[in-house]
């Protein structure tokens, strides 16, 4: 190839793609050619990719950049997972799962970023809050996927898909080059056909840039699941459909029903497409392991409300346009084509051929309790010096017979693993194992005497055509005292947590902690067990929620306490502050108000989604009215009141840090942040724009409009006047008018969403810490005053207990072994019990998967891991 040709080709590729020219001699080893990927095919067909996402393989033959990023729980460090490079016998191009396994050994990892391989920078990251979402992480962020929950085989090698459980989702609300309005666009994805539910909405594709429901036709994505409130196929599903906002659409009918003649999908791996253009859309689907795609629907738009479409261009994965995130599913690869392109059926069939050639298959190796081979819990809990039967299963996904399959388990120092009923540490199957069949061996695993959180490692080695190959897999284990979170209650006058010692020996709980984490809130504290606390064998330990607790720390010399609750308290009552050796007793001198409902520091969309207010600030933007996702409705704060400003978060938000409050005094309460829409088309050159709601917009506000795409452009405008009436925030309200400082540079469509930060809450003194979007803003109220100052300081959530109160807190019987002051138990949350060294002893989620890593039990398709 000449230099001129090399340069010509290189100019058509993203910057992360490399063409490497090698001078080879006559007998040199030349790696196998990496075949063209789906995005090469789309480009050749005239519909190049504008977004290309996969955790399993490169979607271009020449792509050598990162596929995704993982972050580990133990220290917050991150690692980009790239593609395996070619070797003499291997074309490479699949994900480097071994790098992830090494980096994430003995801890948990999250997928923080799914990189865009197209070169347009359309990476997918943690989905921000939205009104239809289950608020999981601080302020309403979605949870991130756990990195190893979806193992598979691709191109004969291990890789991991993106596993979505309810509450999880990835998104990009500020994309580049995606279709907007009625522009054409194509999409495809490969998913697990056995992992789905009827919750909304397991989608991939084009959504709203404000993570809200902006009306019919404001999104167009693929959808997979068996939801029935909208268009749907015959029961029980699942079906390949699309999501076009306020409608899951599998077809368009003429008889007034929403019953579609769609096939019930039974394939383990599924390819699906969703292509839309003016007046027309088409969906196709097929078995990702064999054959061609079939037409699911090819015809007109649903109704005039969807024709023309009003797409906005955001990119979402695993959730809906309004962040509805109640879905289950697993994504392996996906892509969107450029604005104004409509892939032909021939192009989509070639993409399907590329998917089939990638040879997706179930995981080759699993490590599970013997009793749960098909539904592995992902975690086994031992007590020191105990034994359990653990099974290693090898499934031949090579496509040819293999021989000499050897299975074993690698264990932590001080542990042992032997074949059940024998003394050997491995088991070998000499005869051929046919493609698609499995062999397994069960081992007696005995834990050591030392407490441990980490991995068991399952090993397999086999021979193919005289070549020995191997693979490993892991299972999380805990080797800890047999203390269980036995039961709890979330009742205003009966909130408690009970521990149980399932062992035959007493256990010392000195300096253990229990972290109770309410959904959508950061973690501020843990319940601490005092020195000398022992839990008898087969005994119970009861933690009771006190009628009140500190919402911010109290300092030595303070006479005012800011508390969670004052209901039932009376002047003159004796109260206890804290517990154990730290307890102080005082009388109540006066009672004013308890802490109010928190809101969050404003999260702007589509710009943002995280803004940081620097040290030295005296004003913060805030979420008004509804109180944000951290505290529900009812947020109110007044001049002169104390306000707690949360700080200490890290991003992405995974509830892996401890939050704190700094306390300020409010000096002014001005306009909150707001999200609203253009009320009519705005044209380049205009110096006024019509908007739905001007109530919280002020002179001087800067507004970011639109996205960077074909016939559209991003620009920042400055408001110089706010004229006429308030639109009331609704779509039917009378619009208001904004006068702007300079003429518009681009055209912008009616219904375009935008955000305004507002003039915020002012306070003194200036901040000594930085504060970021979605961190809590807590009105502290006026608190209660004491008859004398405190003799020592007390931490946030320390007990404030008034024995005379019967209307709040745990009332018994029986009396608790220990009181705790907060946080109050919520309707959803997680609990994590740790020993004195910080090892996790027990954990659970309730009311939702608030902290996925703390989940115990099988997470996956109802039909099992290998089906």
Task: Give names to the regions the model predicted.
Residues 375-386, 489-491:
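Short, solvent-exposed loop/linker segments at the N-terminal edge
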Residues 432, 446-452:
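Short, surface-exposed loop/turn segments at beta-strand-coil junctions that are enriched for proline
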Residues 32-49, 58, 62, 73-75, ...:
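Extracellular glycan-associated modules
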Residues 400-404, 504-510, 841:
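Short acidic/proline- and small/hydrophobic-mixed sequence motifs that coincide with surface turns
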Residues 30-137, 188, 356-359, 484, ...:
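GGW-centered surface loops in extracellular recognition modules
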Residues 385-400, 492-505:
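Short beta-strand elements of extracellular/lumenal beta-sandwich folds
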Residues 474-520, 546, 570, 580, ...:
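A structural motif detector for short, solvent-exposed N-terminal "entry" segments of globular domains
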Residues 36-39, 533-796, 800-805:
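Autoprocessing Asn-cyclization modules and mimics
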């Amino acid at each position: 190839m000449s230099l001129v040709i090399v340069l010509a080709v290189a100019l058509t590729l993203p910057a992360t793609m490399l063409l490497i020219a090698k001078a080879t001699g006559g007998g040199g080893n030349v790696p196998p050619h990496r075949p063209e990927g789906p995005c090469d095919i789309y480009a050749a067909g005239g519909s190049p990719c504008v977004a290309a996402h996969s955790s399993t393989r490169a979607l271009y033959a020449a792509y050598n950049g990162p596929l995704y990023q993982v972050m580990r729980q133990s220290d917050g460090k991150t690692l980009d997972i790239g593609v395996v490079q070619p070797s003499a016998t291997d074309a490479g191009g699949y994900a480097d799962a071994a790098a992830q396994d090494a980096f994430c050994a003995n801890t948990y990892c999250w997928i923080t970023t799914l990189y865009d391989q197209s070169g347009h920078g359309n990476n997918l990251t943690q989905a921000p809050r939205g009104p239809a979402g289950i608020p999981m992480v601080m302020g309403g962020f979605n949870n991130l996927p756990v990195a190893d929950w979806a193992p598979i085989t691709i191109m004969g090698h291990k890789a991991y898909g993106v596993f979505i459980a309810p509450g999880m989702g990835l998104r990009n609300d500020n994309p580049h080059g995606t279709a907007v309005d009625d522009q054409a666009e194509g999409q495809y994805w490969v998913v697990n056909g056995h992992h789905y539910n009827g919750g909304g909405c397991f989608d991939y594709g084009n959504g709203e840039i404000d993570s809200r429901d902006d009306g019919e036709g404001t999104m167009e994505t693929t959808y997979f699941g068996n939801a029935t409130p909208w268009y749907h196929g015959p029961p029980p599903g699942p079906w390949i459909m699309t999501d076009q906002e306020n409608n899951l659409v599998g077809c368009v009918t003429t008889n007034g029903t929403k019953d579609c003649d769609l096939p019930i999908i039974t394939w383990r791996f599924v390819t699906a497409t969703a292509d839309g253009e003016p007046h027309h859309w088409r969906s196709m689907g097929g078995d990702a392991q064999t054959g061609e795609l079939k037409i699911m629907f090819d015809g007109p738009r649903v109704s005039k409300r969807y024709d023309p479409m009003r797409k906005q261009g955001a990119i979402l994965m695993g959730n809906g346009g309004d962040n509805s995130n109640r879905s289950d599913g697993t994504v392996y690869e996906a892509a969107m084509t450029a604005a104004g392109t409509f892939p032909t059926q021939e192009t989509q069939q070639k993409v399907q051929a590329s998917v089939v050639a990638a040879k997706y298959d179930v995981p080759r190796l699993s490590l599970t309790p013997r009793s749960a081979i098909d539904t592995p819990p992902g975690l086994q809990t031992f007590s020191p010096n105990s034994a359990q039967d653990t099974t290693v299963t090898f499934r031949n996904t090579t496509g040819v017979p293999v021989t000499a399959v050897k299975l074993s388990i690698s264990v932590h120092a001080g542990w042992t693993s032997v074949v059940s009923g024998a003394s050997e540490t491995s088991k070998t199957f000499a005869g051929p194992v046919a493609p698609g069949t499995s062999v397994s061996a069960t081992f007696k695993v005995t834990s050591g005497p030392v407490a441990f959180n980490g991995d068991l490692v399952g090993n397999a080695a086999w021979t193919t055509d005289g070549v020995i190959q191997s693979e490993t897999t892991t299972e999380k284990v805990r080797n800890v005292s047999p203390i269980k979170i036995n039961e709890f209650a979330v009742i205003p006058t009966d909130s408690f947590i009970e521990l149980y010692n399932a062992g035959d020996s007493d256990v010392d709980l000195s300096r253990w902690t229990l972290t109770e984490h309410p959904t959508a809130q950061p973690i501020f504290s843990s319940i601490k067990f005092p020195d000398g606390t022992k839990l008898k064998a087969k005994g119970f330990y009861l933690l009771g929620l006190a009628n009140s607790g500190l919402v911010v720390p109290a300092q030595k010399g303070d006479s005012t306490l800011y508390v969670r609750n004052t209901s039932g308290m009376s002047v003159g009552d004796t109260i206890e502050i804290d517990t154990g050796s730290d307890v102080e007793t005082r009388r109540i001198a006066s009672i004013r108000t308890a802490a109010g409902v928190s809101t969050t520091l404003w999260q702007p969309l589509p710009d943002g989604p995280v803004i940081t207010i620097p040290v030295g600030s005296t004003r913060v933007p805030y979420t008004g009215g509804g109180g944000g996702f951290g505290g529900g409705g009812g947020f109110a704060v007044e001049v002169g009141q104390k306000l707690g400003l949360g700080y200490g978060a890290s991003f992405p938000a995974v509830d892996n840090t401890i939050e704190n409050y700094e306390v300020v005094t409010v000096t002014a309460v001005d306009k909150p942040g707001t999200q609203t829409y253009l009320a009519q088309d705005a044209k380049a050159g205009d110096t006024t724009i019509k908007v739905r709601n001007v109530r919280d917009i002020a002179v001087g506000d800067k507004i970011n409009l639109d996205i960077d795409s074909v016939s559209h452009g991003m620009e920042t405008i400055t408001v110089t006047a706010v004229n006429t009436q308030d639109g009331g925030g609704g779509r039917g309200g009378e619009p208001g008018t904004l006068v702007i400082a300079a003429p518009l540079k681009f055209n912008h469509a009616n219904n375009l969403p935008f955000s305004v930060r507002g003039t915020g809450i002012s306070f003194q003194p200036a901040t000594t810490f930085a504060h970021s979007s979605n961190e809590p803003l807590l009105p502290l109220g006026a608190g209660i005053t004491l008859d004398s100052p405190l003799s020592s300081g007390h931490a946030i959530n320390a007990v404030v207990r008034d024995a005379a109160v019967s209307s709040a807190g745990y009332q018994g019987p029986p009396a608790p072994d220990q009181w705790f002051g907060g946080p109050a138990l919520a309707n959803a949350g997680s609990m994590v019990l740790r020993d004195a060294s910080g090892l996790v002893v027990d954990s659970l989620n309730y009311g939702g998967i608030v902290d996925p890593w703390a989940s115990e039990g099988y997470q996956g398709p109802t039909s099992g891991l290998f089906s």
